Amino acid sequence: MAEMGLKTYRFSVSWARIYPEGRGEVNPKGIEFYENIIDECLKYGIEPMVTIYHWDLPQALVDLYGGWESEEIIEDYVNYAKTLFKAYGSKVKYWITFNEQNIFTSLGWLTAQHPPGKFDDQKTFVRPYKPLRWRLTAPQF
């Protein structure tokens, strides 16, 4: 990438790699995995740009309380984001809190092409509220 002249590398962190159960104990190997990516980028003068959530909600949270269907998701997301900021905040300048929020909700609830695979046009327009709250909450840390 450096030989190609790239100045920035955008990648997404897998929530389940950091928190295998979606919450609870942090997976140190998951933290190390992304730290290695970040360190390699910086070593070659490439600025890491980290996407916190890219459509990969841990199945454990869906099973536990319905994932996006529950307000509990907000607290778990904030905890996940804080974990990333603490682990990588001194090395990462650019963060994307949520990847394509409008696509995630429409494919999940309007067309049922992505999880949760439900066709509910009313919820399609309500679901963006929660990721919007995430966006407004995460930068506070």
Predicted features along the sequence, with ranges:
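Short alpha-helix boundary/capping motifs
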Residues: 29-30, 69
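Glycine-rich, proline-tolerant flexible connector loops at the mouths of alpha/beta enzymes
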Residues: 13-26
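General structural concept
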Residues: 10-11, 15, 30-36
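Active-site region of glycoside hydrolase catalytic domains
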Residues: 21-22, 35-141
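Catalytic domains of carbohydrate-active enzymes, especially glycoside hydrolases
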Residues: 1-14, 47
